[in-house]
Amino acid sequence: MAGTDREKALDAALAQIERQFGKGAVMRLGERPNEPIEVIPTGSTALDVALGVGGLPRGRVVEVYGPESSGKTTLTLHAVANAQKAGGQVAFVDAEHALDPEYAKKLGVDIDNLILSQPDNGEQALEIVDMLVRSGALDLIVIDSVAALVPRAEIEGEMGDSHVGLQARLMSQALRKITSALNQSKTTAIFINQLREKIGVMFGSPETTTGGRALKFYASVRLDIRRIETLKDGTDAVGNRTRVKVVKNKVAPPFKQAEFDILYGQGISREGGLIDMGVENGFVRKAGAWYTYEGDQLGQGKENARNFLKDNPDLANEIEKKIKEKLGVGVRPEEPTAEPGADAAVTSAAAATDDTAKTVSAPAAKTTKSKAAAAKS
């Protein structure tokens, strides 16, 4: 009898909450629709796989941090380009006042439709972010960078004044306000951050990020990006080998790593990453300096194989699909008119896999191979 009374009381409370706050304000977890995680591809197949869901999750906070010139902005601009190619609206809050539109254009960003803000101080920047997110019209918003979100009091004060904790409090308040709106509008917020060193640390890493601890807690994904090697063509440096570690991930298992090439003036080499992952997963065969795919030679040396895939985007897409299907992450939907190196639309991992099964047929694969052979000859 007591149990029945408790159930009636709970049902009455739930009904009252729904009347007061609206339908869906409270529900049993099993009644909530289990929607697949929608993502924005990063431009690197290896990183999409390391993230576990095929890209950066929609409606979440993402932090990208690392040393100077490690590729933070480049990685973010690739995500911007991919969101735009899917028909999404993107805003870029350039607090550093350092965005190069020509470089962004080379990476595939539609600069004519990119919403840009270059705020005067941190409060103004985060107020703009809050208003844009609450509009519900954005798919992605980028803040570059957290370190440049200088509080108004610091800008208006004297050079030697101490402003302890101002930026941390500002970030904490802003994240409290925008996190819920991000989830409701399915907008991804990417915060680019810089590294600092703690003084007097004897054990462990002295490195830390700016802006206090709030961003570490609110971020669903945190990416640590580092330059590990300089790529050279003879004696000339042509790019960097980059490693990204997923140090926090709320949507898949964390602590996975991805490596890819960033070429100067071109950005992330998608084709180079496909060759590396193709060899690793057995789809591309390497014999000496030659790379082959299903009996067809891609080229002698990685650079020639990379150029061949760039000239044959259908073949590159086919290799990418096979890699992602094998590893069980989101697959790029087929785009017949896609340009070389063009990246995927924003898709969910599960839906994309189903779409691929429907769109890829044996005749299409044969046509691709015949094109590859013709291009070789």
Curated annotation (Swiss-Prot):
Keyword Zinc-finger, does the record have it? no
Q: InterPro entries attached here?
A: AAA+_ATPase (IPR003593), DNA_recomb/repair_RecA (IPR013765), DNA_recomb/repair_RecA_CS (IPR020584), P-loop_NTPase (IPR027417), RecA-like_C (IPR049261), RecA-like_N (IPR049428), RecA_ATP-bd (IPR020588), RecA_C_sf (IPR023400)
* UniProt key word DNA repair: yes
Single GO molecular function:
single-stranded DNA binding
Q: Where does the UniProt annotation locate this protein?
A: Cytoplasm
Locate the region Disordered.
329-377
Q: Which family does it belong to?
A: Belongs to the RecA family.
Q: What is this protein called?
A: Protein RecA
Q: Which organism is it from?
A: Streptomyces avermitilis (strain ATCC 31267 / DSM 46492 / JCM 5070 / NBRC 14893 / NCIMB 12804 / NRRL 8165 / MA-4680)
